[in-house]
Amino acid sequence: MSTLVNTTRRSIVIAIHQQLRRMSVQKRKDQSATIAVGQMRSTSDKAANLSQVIELVDRAKSQNACMLFLPECCDFVGESRTQTIELSEGLDGELMAQYRELAKCNKIWISLGGVHERNDQKIFNAHVLLNEKGELAAVYRKLHMFDVTTKEVRLRESDTVTPGYCLERPVSTPVGQIGLQICYDLRFAEPAVLLRKLGANLLTYPSAFTYATGKAHWEILLRARAIETQCFVVAAAQIGWHNQKRQSWGHSMIVSPWGNVLADCSEQELDIGTAEVDLSVLQSLYQTMPCFEHRRNDIYALTAYNLRSKEPTQDRPFATNIVDKRTIFYESEHCFAFTNLRCVVKGHVLVSTKRVTPRLCGLDCAEMADMFTTVCLVQRLLEKIYQTTSATVTVQDGAQAGQTVPHVHFHIMPRRLGDFGHNDQIYVKLDERAEEKPPRTIEERIEEAQIYRKFLTDIS
């Protein structure tokens, strides 16, 4: 009898282990996807370059890739500043329409690593992400300009290219949260770290590295960015001679978060490399090497300025109160701005921290930097909307300073000529408002927040 029981128990244990293994394998499948990184040699012939892109899409599809990453200048490489401006198009142009149709017909995401986007007398170097429906999922405009002037050489990218104004938040895709960068951005670690902090698990650096700098630094930099951010890194590259003056290094790569090279197109002129991106490995890596948990935000901090706000997804605590997400019109990493229950002047809003802490001195370095950045952004927003040139910005830091809600927050109040008989009377009104002014309705506050949110979207 005992033998039968033991055999039955062993059978049950084996069955459970087999089921767990199947579940583990299925989980890995659900979290993994095949991606392709392309390599090409663009010239000033846009039609020929498009033919190369079509060929790379075909190869990516044949390898069952759900996403193809193309290099910087996948549209063309101009032979002069004048030609570059002449060949550039807007994102609503004919070439972009062809790219979008290509993504839609093949049901594949495409990273257009750097197209020349027309912008008045200059261009933007724009990294455009298309989804499988051919829609624009995101546009990032290159931040860092390669400007060098020496006795031997004068090379100023900013003569032709207008630098971008902000980082773009990571984009949700079938292969994870993707952080968008371009070429020379690779030499700056700060954006990569910020993108990881914002949720990126894959960084992409489409490039046209020169032969000399590529040979010296390309692989080292890609692996460094992967290791320090614990992200997959994908870098599509141009290769070969584009014209008599310009040669690119090539070696399109996919790098793992551990710094291993998963794919390298080497020196093939038209090629793709593929790799399986398995996001399940990230959690294990974060647990065994929790570098981002060990960052000393009380000693140093990185802050992304002009970052576009996400649509608020949850209500926020304000001490023991709850701020309805519909009244929040801006969110940063650590702070949020919302419309006020009782206003001293029209446009009186509040900025507070996501973490509940009563005093300004209780904020860490990252929260302080983010708080003041957010306050300045909101102040500029209100002055544009209400056509004013002044604002009272104040924080009542503690009960004896007039704080009634024990959660650090700034009051931002647009000022107008003659709005108070005596300028400092605004502080008296600030203390009196709880007794004297009735609370505004939730509908009023939501409507006001929608106006501010739309304005932020439009100026972005």
Curated annotation (Swiss-Prot):
Database matches in InterPro entries: C-N_Hydrolase, C-N_Hydrolase_sf, FHIT, Histidine_triad_CS, HIT-like, HIT-like_sf, Nit1/2_C-N_Hydrolase
EC number of the protein: 3.6.1.29, 3.5.-.-
CDD domains: FHIT, nit
Domain of life (superkingdom): Eukaryota
Broadest EC class assigned to this enzyme: hydrolase
HIT domain span: 315-422
Active site residues per record: 72, 142, 183, 409 (tele-amp-histidine intermediate)
Start and end residues of each CN hydrolase domain: 33-279
Motif Histidine triad motif in this chain: 407-411
Gene3D superfamilies to which the protein is assigned, alphabetical: Carbon-nitrogen hydrolase (3.60.110.10), HIT-like (3.30.428.10)
GO molecular function: bis(5'-adenosyl)-triphosphatase activity; deaminated glutathione amidase activity; nucleotide binding
Pfam hit, one: HIT
Subunit structure: Homotetramer.
Matches recorded under PANTHER family: DEAMINATED GLUTATHIONE AMIDASE (PTHR23088:SF27), NITRILASE-RELATED (PTHR23088)
Protein name: Nitrilase and fragile histidine triad fusion protein NitFhit
Gene, per the UniProt record: NitFhit
